[in-house]
């Protein structure tokens, strides 16, 4: 992680003439200072949405699943759509933290902390949906293989839904440990700057006695690499297992082998879009434009563009395989998606996920903050509709025409979904006021190689050296 030479053509990752002390002050300011008006506005809206969603959840649990728009044919709808959408959003955090760490990508330094927090908070939202969907959430622990005295009660290890339980719990625990490990030097920094004894005690407990000695740093880097190695397979395996919820069934439109890679690409695609959405808001609210630069936004836009193209290829491959299979029911399932009663959701998905990311080929657009923000939201709207199309359009047309039906969401469906978005932002905003949103210790390691003033000095030194010769 030591500083090394960087080509002058590379744009700086820290702009403004920043010293090590400036980095500490800038990162600690949102935690130590008072919340501004923008923070309170966003927090109030998020809290109102969360409370509405909480009311809808309580109503569902006390009344029953009949409060949703489910019917005799469409037994899975918005609940599983939202579950898959939230799990997918979490993938970018692990990819930025683990995969880009192993590839030694310096641009991850400023964005990894918030991306990891986003992973944890989105997995928490995802976990709510299967629990509510049980109908009797107080029996939720029955999905865990806990030895019991209930007679023949035991989990079915052949069920993809049980695989989900293991995948999500492993993902959440590894992400939490990874995130916390990265936070240790930053908690220690806040502990040393704390003014009140209570704050000092809290951050002292959270920092696990971090002293900043060489031995601490050595162990920190070793643990980071080990956790990155553990988390990298999780990026691929978690959404693969989520796709098995569909791929291991026999329903036309679900029973296809392309789903695992297609889901993983879609997860990274939607995750990076959400990271972009959050960081563009946060760099403004927390005054962190010098650390989350246009260069960071551009690099994430390039990832969105590439994964969007992969998702587009997956859509076309899916259509080709349905045609090539010669199975009439498979062909009908895909034809019905594009031309049936839900045609609008299919074409909305295609427009948002395949066409909109292609505008990123233009450097002018991918370096424009407002355009990036709009496209990142459009992409996540498209990815929600992708899950809706996969789930609802495959179910609403059965082998028996007498079972054909339409799905109509109720206010409870919408309320729970909006409530989880509100809950996510409540958690994220509270995190941004309690924890450092940028890994200041890691940003300092690239300051001399990628800092604005250091690069300028080195370039000037290079010119002087060549003039002397």
Which sequence ranges carry the predicted segments?
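Transmembrane-helix bundle segments that line or gate the permeation/cavity pathway
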Residues: 2-18, 58-69, 73-76, 83-214, ...
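Central hydrophobic cores of alpha-helical transmembrane segments
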Residues: 371-381
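C-terminal TM-helix exit segments that contain a strictly Trp-centered aromatic cap at the helix terminus
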Residues: 53-60, 127-137, 314-321, 382-393
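Hydrophobic alpha-helical transmembrane segments
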Residues: 87-95, 348-357, 423-424
